Swiss-Prot record:
Gene3D superfamilies tied to this protein: 3.30.70.3000
E.C. no: 2.7.7.79
Organism: Arabidopsis thaliana
Residues binding GTP: 307-312, 353-354
Gene: THG2
Entry protein name: tRNA(His) guanylyltransferase 2
Cofactor(s) the record lists: Mg(2+)
């Protein structure tokens, strides 16, 4: 990071490390997937193809992140369990939850056509994620039992509901019929009215799906699969690097929290621990802890900052222009515009390179200010939009692998401190862009990267400007403002003519579309010209 007088704003960042010996679970849920399923005409009560898509995405997550050793999912949710010794991203909660949600969203978009070849993806899917911290393997067992119980109850209810709706009843009539019904009553309703034996329904619907890694190289068993080799990364030319390693296994079990199921798989109790006994009733206090959500301080400005994950490699593989690829920056800006259009509580965004900072209004109650939901929703929506709009900005360049972004949320108590944060990011933009412009011009002139770094070591702004001017004929201040200033995204105000009774026309300001600007946001003039952005008087 660049050193500046604004660096103090980093002191407002809060550590969110999940401490040992707690086990880490990342649970993701589809954001407003009831609407998503309606728009894309999923079958009710269960769409087998959409569930297989979710399972395929979860499998990709296990391949991408070796520290994730177990996953359980049903409907539009999945829970990913990290091995007990994991130090993934220093166990920082916001980073982990946002990264998993982002990658899952990217893979969901990537695989959509594979599972729905004749259905257009109408809009960007997104996911909310959270960290569940389990103090022991017994708590993990209770969590898994809780999720599978919820799978069973939800599926049984939904099966009854949709069979009644298909028989001609209205949704409200159906809900009234099912109100306060118990498990046995719902089973009888299905059998007596529709001839359905609930226990004979596909296990995929009733039991959910679990994935875990096994050392077996190849085998064939009902409901599980794995390959002989996998792509673990891509080299500098974008070619897949394949390597034999533990396989991810997909199974359906009546009791994923059962001692017999868990302990028969040596990889599970090695990575996570033994289940000493079967679980009976789930402790209510455990459930309360699973549902706990940390909230951001009220009446503070919240900044959700997202950063591309390993974007140095991503830019090399996709042959972005150096030091700046204008199309890549415009793609980022387009995604930021989409975020502001999707989330009305976001008032402003500032971006440079592979990062963007989104400012929520200080009075925002988005997701009841639940930190994890806000971060993951923004990051995953940004990611899936990036995937869907790639072809608009790179029509002749294939996306070789899905990108991912991590995020964090920081509270700033006053507007002055918020503006200092934004100034810090723009100062950083200038310093990094000036350095990178010099660096890549030196490399293109024949110097090695190490030689270019040594040449620039200890140089100041004036010296870099002279280098560009004297050696390469480049006036730094004449470079495109999108490179030098970064991008500001906000809702524009336009003048609308209003005819008064006396016949005079006065101007009335109305909010219009979201736009992109390349201004100096350190200067107070910008904020004075656009007081509506942060509701300044």
């Amino acid at each position: 990071m660049a050193n500046s007088k604004y660096e103090y704003v980093k002191s407002f960042e809060v550590e969110d490390e999940v401490m040992f010996p707690n086990l880490i679970i990342i649970r993701i849920d589809g954001r407003d997937f009831s609407r998503f399923s309606q728009v894309h005409k999923f079958e009710k009560p269960n769409d087998e193809t959409s569930l297989n898509l979710m399972n395929s995405c979860a499998s990709s997550v296990l391949v991408e992140y070796p520290d994730i050793v177990f996953a359980y999912g049903y409907s539009d949710e999945y829970s990913f369990v990290f091995k007990k010794a994991s130090r993934f991203y220093q166990r920082r909660a916001s980073k982990i939850l946002s990264l998993v949600a982002s990658f899952f969203a990217a893979v969901y978009v990537t695989k959509w056509k594979e599972f729905f070849p004749h259905t257009k993806l109408e809009y960007a899917p997104s996911f909310a994620s959270k960290v569940v911290s389990c103090a022991s393997v017994e708590v993990l067992q209770a969590y898994l039992a809780w999720r599978q119980h919820d799978c069973h109850i939800s599926n049984q209810y939904d099966t009854c509901l949709w069979m009644l709706v298909k028989s001609g009843k209205t949704l409200s009539e159906t809900q009234e019929i099912l109100k306060d019904t118990q498990k046995q009553q719902r089973n009888e309703l299905l059998f007596q009215q529709f001839g359905i034996n609930y226990k004979m329904l596909p296990v995929l619907f009733r039991q959910g799906s679990c994935l875990f890694k096994t050392k077996v190289i190849f085998s064939i068993i009902s409901f599980f699969y794995f390959l002989l080799e996998e792509t673990v990364k891509h080299d500098e030319n974008g070619k897949p690097v394949k390597r034999l390693r533990r396989r991810e296994t997909l199974v359906h079990s009546e009791n994923v929290a059962g001692r017999s199921f868990w302990n028969e798989h040596s990889s599970l109790h090695k990575d996570l621990g033994h289940f000493a006994k079967d679980i009976g009733k789930i402790e209510p206090d455990y459930v309360k802890s699973f549902q706990f959500e940390s909230r951001l301080l009220p009446l503070t400005w919240v900044v959700v900052r997202i950063d591309g994950c390993h974007f140095h490699r991503f830019s090399e593989v996709h042959e972005f222009e150096k030091p700046n690829d204008e199309q890549a920056l415009k793609l980022m800006n387009s995604c930021a515009v989409a975020v502001l259009e999707e989330f009305q509580d976001i008032a402003f965004a500032y971006g440079v390179s592979d990062e963007f900072s989104f400012v929520l209004k200080n009075k925002s109650e988005l997701y009841k200010r639940q930190s994890s939901k806000i971060i993951s929703a923004v990051v995953s929506f940004f990611t899936s939009t990036y995937m869907m709009r790639w072809g608009d900005f790179f029509p002749h360049k294939k996306l070789k692998y899905p990108p991912s972004f991590d995020g964090r949320a920081v509270c700033y108590p006053t507007s002055d401190i918020l503006l200092d944060y934004l100034a810090w990011r723009q100062v950083d933009c200038h310093i990094n862009n000036q350095y990178n412009t010099c660096f890549w011009m030196l490399v293109k002139s024949g110097k090695s990267k190490i030689q270019a770094q040594d040449y620039l070591k200890g140089t100041q702004t004036r010296e870099k400007n002279e280098l560009l001017s004297q050696q390469f004929g480049i006036e730094y201040n004449s470079l495109p403002v999108i490179f030098r200033m970064g991008s500001s995204v906000f809702r524009l105000k336009t003048q609308e003519g209003v005819t008064e009774e006396n016949g005079e026309v006065s101007g009335k300001q109305v909010e219009a579309e979201v736009g992109v600007d390349y201004s100096n946001i350190i200067d107070q003039c910008f904020w004075q010209q656009h007081p509506h952005i942060l509701s300044f008087s």
